[in-house]
């Protein structure tokens, strides 16, 4: 959300200490919840930017044209902003193709955003440059492990720490097919210093893990936080949680092992699913036959991959139930089709849009 503090014709609102010149909110398709005062509300594509993304971003740039040192831009930023806030420096179709390639490559979010920054007129600190000399006060909800401010939503209002050399290495590592125009963009450095920006982090995966731990305790489980920086392959994370489950089968207490972060998926098939669903299904293979043992994993925003599910839930009987239907977990994972397998055994988790995004959480439950 971008708000400009002054007067904006008939859309004027009261703002303590000044006047609201105008504002715009950009969210995912289907996530708008009605009007917010006089702010413009726009829905756009995610995880791949679409024409609505580009149009909404143009409106935000127009709103912040011609600012002075007396103006302040209140910039509310969260995960998903890389897709929702975009003014490409390459043809739109190529940007969409590169984004899809990165999403399928197994690249982590830092690697993806390093490339995205250099293909954009608003990422990597360039939006703050556009707003200058106005002050940009950025309030950030972090969805990246370690809270790197230049990487969250690709850092529209923060100095960029990545380099052209980083971008070249990532493009080569993942075999990105780039036009000469896109290749030239990778050679253009992003702003390394911005003196008109102030930033505040208001939430992250640490708060998510703390809240999940408290909920587990209320349900009678003793919470054990394994990590709040989970960043491996989804299948590896599922196998790890299964190993933890087997190592603690002799416990006399009900335990909840939690892991927060964001895994990745390297697409090898043409199925449907998301990283949390794939993590859960991988865990199902490892906990097969264990009684009173379950694993669930979900995205805090209520969306896991290009599906309507937030994640997945499995227990010690999931593998057998799928086998009775002729479904083999290994084959499903190879085809990246966790969604349909979990749907077949009632293992999909649906929360709907939560209105926040602070990574994912996976939980192993052992009940005694």
PLM regions with names:
Residues 88-109, 160-175, 269-295:
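Gly/Ser/Thr-rich active-site loops/lids in small-molecule metabolic enzymes
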